[in-house]
Regions:
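Short, low-complexity N-terminal intrinsically disordered segments enriched in polar/charged residues
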Residues: 1-40
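A solvent-exposed, acidic/Ser-Thr-rich amphipathic alpha-helical stretch
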Residues: 12, 31-93, 98
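Short solvent-exposed loop/turn micro-motifs enriched in small/polar/acidic residues
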Residues: 17, 77-79, 112-114
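Short, well-ordered beta-to-alpha junction loops that form the rim of enzyme active sites
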Residues: 97-99, 133-134
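Hydrophobic beta-strand positions in extracellular immunoglobulin-like domains
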Residues: 99-101, 122
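Short, cysteine-centered beta-strand-loop-beta hairpins and adjacent loop/turn segments enriched
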Residues: 101-112
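Short beta-strand edge/turn micro-motifs at domain boundaries
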Residues: 113-141
Length: 141
């Protein structure tokens, strides 16, 4: 999953590949898939005001064993991420999109939707060195 960006500038295409790899890691909950996303000293904020999870192995552990700042482990087949890069500047990117959750794996009834804004920073090897998640739910009618 490493996408070397040292020779070239970070692009929308690189960020989209990273987002696709993130969605795959979320689907698999495979430690190696998660590990491949982040730099050794990465920081991950589940919410903007949280103290970050610090270090790749701490991030992997938080994904695989939720608690604390991480919520719960999602049931396979009950969620889907639809994310895309919105802006890329230097080694920073903003991604936007939705994460949809269904009541069960049949995906017949939507339980909730989150609108996402992710602030991302990448190192020269194309790994995320800083991740901050902002999300909101639809307005109530």
């Amino acid at each position: 999953m490493s996408h070397d960006v040292t020779a070239t500038k970070l692009t929308h295409e690189h960020v989209q590949r990273w987002l696709d790899d993130y969605a795959k890691a979320w689907d698999t909950y495979d430690g190696d898939d998660v590990r491949a996303l982040f730099s050794r000293d990465a920081e991950y904020r589940w919410h903007p005001a949280d103290d970050p999870e610090k270090g790749r192995e701490t991030i992997v552990d938080a994904w695989l064993n939720p608690g604390g700042n991480a919520s719960t482990r999602d049931v396979p087949g009950t969620y889907k991420a639809d994310l895309r890069p919105f802006a890329v500047d230097g080694n920073r990117a903003v991604a936007v999109g939705t994460c949809t959750y269904w009541t069960d794996a049949t995906r017949s009834k939507v339980e909730r939707i989150y609108y996402n804004n992710w602030l991302l920073e990448f190192d020269d090897d194309g790994k995320c060195s800083s991740f901050t998640e902002y999300y909101m739910t639809p307005r109530k009618s």
